């Protein structure tokens, strides 16, 4: 059913984006592959989420989980994690990696909108990291994430700001100069300003708690969290 809905365009997914990530799926867990940046920022993302939401014992949903890098680390922190994605190959890789790691994650092929209709107000924590800039309708994604969170639950989004600096760093720098990412990974027109994401979230019934920037130092090759939200940023909300 889901495959037919994807094909006929009734699901909030960009088929070109889906195929792009499917082609790279076998490399998700290679820390020196195209997914190296995700491996490097994962401890920062995990620490930030855990600091706010205290993951141990919580029911957590990871939206757009891909190969499961964040999902598994949240499971290792003591959470009961469900990961959803629409990429068949990414989900297969995620499930296979569980056999190696021994972690427990419930992976499902589902859109966030479909799961919100099935399990409203079900999760203590909802994460949607590095996904909003890849979907045709981010407003729909934000609304569904809000619907999935329990009252008082936490919802986290990370994405890329839209301004000349983010174009220079996230597109030109990351994809063409430093070769951190494959060319064509990002579409500048899909980048989202923090003010825009904040408005989407407020309209979905979420209350903003914090926005924090995530920066890359090309000299030290180290990522860090700080006040600079000009390029990558994370926003934390309560339902």
UniProtKB/Swiss-Prot annotation:
Keywords: Methyltransferase, S-adenosyl-L-methionine, Transferase, Ubiquinone biosynthesis. Its EC number is 2.1.1.222, 2.1.1.64. S-adenosyl-L-methionine binds at residues 45, 64, 85, 129. Pathway: Cofactor biosynthesis; ubiquinone biosynthesis. SUPFAM superfamilies: S-adenosyl-L-methionine-dependent methyltransferases (SSF53335). One of its GO terms (biological process) is methylation. GO terms for molecular function: 2-polyprenyl-6-hydroxyphenol methylase activity; 3-demethylubiquinol 3-O-methyltransferase activity; polyprenyldihydroxybenzoate methyltransferase activity. The keyword Membrane does not apply. It is an enzyme of class 2 (transferase). It catalyses: a 3-demethylubiquinol + S-adenosyl-L-methionine = a ubiquinol + S-adenosyl-L-homocysteine + H(+); a 3-(all-trans-polyprenyl)benzene-1,2-diol + S-adenosyl-L-methionine = a 2-methoxy-6-(all-trans-polyprenyl)phenol + S-adenosyl-L-homocysteine + H(+). Pfam families: Methyltransf_23. Belongs to the methyltransferase superfamily. UbiG/COQ3 family. O-methyltransferase that catalyzes the 2 O-methylation steps in the ubiquinone biosynthetic pathway. This is Ubiquinone biosynthesis O-methyltransferase. It comes from Nitrosospira multiformis (strain ATCC 25196 / NCIMB 11849 / C 71).
């Amino acid at each position: 059913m889901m495959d037919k809905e994807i094909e006929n365009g009734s699901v909030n997914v960009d088929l070109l984006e889906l195929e792009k990530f499917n082609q790279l799926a076998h490399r998700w867990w290679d820390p020196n592959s195209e997914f190296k940046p995700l491996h490097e920022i994962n401890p920062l993302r995990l620490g930030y989420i855990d600091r706010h939401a205290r993951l141990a014992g919580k029911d957590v949903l990871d939206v757009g989980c891909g190969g499961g890098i964040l999902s598994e680390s949240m499971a290792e922190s003591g959470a009961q994690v469900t990961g959803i994605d629409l990429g068949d190959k990414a989900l297969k890789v995620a499930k296979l990696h569980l056999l190696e790691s021994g972690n427990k994650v419930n992976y499902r092929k589902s859109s966030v909108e479909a799961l919100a209709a099935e399990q409203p107000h079900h999760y203590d924590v909802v994460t949607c990291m590095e996904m909003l800039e890849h979907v045709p309708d981010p407003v729909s994604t934000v609304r569904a994430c809000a619907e999935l969170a329990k009252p008082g639950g936490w919802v986290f989004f990370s994405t890329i700001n839209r301004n000349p600096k983010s174009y220079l760093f996230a597109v030109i720098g990351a994809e063409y100069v430093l070769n951190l990412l494959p060319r064509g990974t990002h579409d500048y027109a899909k980048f989202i300003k923090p003010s825009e994401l904040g408005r989407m979230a407020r309209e979905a019934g979420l209350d903003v708690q914090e926005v924090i920037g995530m920066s890359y130092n090309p000299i030290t090759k180290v990522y860090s969290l700080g006040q600079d939200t000009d390029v990558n940023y994370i926003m934390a909300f309560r339902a």
